[in-house]
């Protein structure tokens, strides 16, 4: 497994590490891995903080250490250092932090759930919403329930048909036939539109 650290981010880490005790590297970790409130982080990793169970990924001028629990949740992670007019910031994208990547041959319900958690729900989160996969019917329909800002939103039908259904049918073309909303929508202050 490799974690992609851009050249700019590697240079940033090198500058920071130059100010630390010799032999200090970085640690990449996930707090609450596999949960909706998973958060990724980077910290200094002095020599004496390296555990025998840690995974080491070597870069040109330093190593990144990852603890055994965080390791599978950091698959496909990317770290970048972006400089803009307003300043600079380190970005860490870890698409599998909230849910471990599933195998291509995993049951359909697991693969659809993974797609929802890693691709669809992050898009809905901007409106305070999310969807939950209830089941997949024998005829291939994904039964979904909307929550948060999506519950009671007047745009939910458009989101369902033009967004979620199109995306899921494209990803699971030969396996899914459609999606169905089983939410009892109640319009309220929580609703986005």
Curated annotation (Swiss-Prot):
Binds 1 [4Fe-4S] cluster per subunit. The cluster is presumably bound at the interface of two monomers. One of its GO terms (molecular function) is iron ion binding. Pfam families: Fe-S_biosyn, NifU. GO terms for biological process: iron-sulfur cluster assembly; protein maturation. Its cofactor is [4Fe-4S] cluster. [4Fe-4S] cluster binds at residues 150, 153. InterPro entries: Fe/S_biogenesis_protein_NfuA, FeS_biogenesis, FSCA_dom_sf, HesB-like_dom_sf, NIF_FeS_clus_asmbl_NifU_C. Keywords: 4Fe-4S, Iron, Iron-sulfur, Metal-binding. Belongs to the NfuA family. Involved in iron-sulfur cluster biogenesis. Binds a 4Fe-4S cluster, can transfer this cluster to apoproteins, and thereby intervenes in the maturation of Fe/S proteins. Could also act as a scaffold/chaperone for damaged Fe/S proteins. Homodimer. This is Fe/S biogenesis protein NfuA.
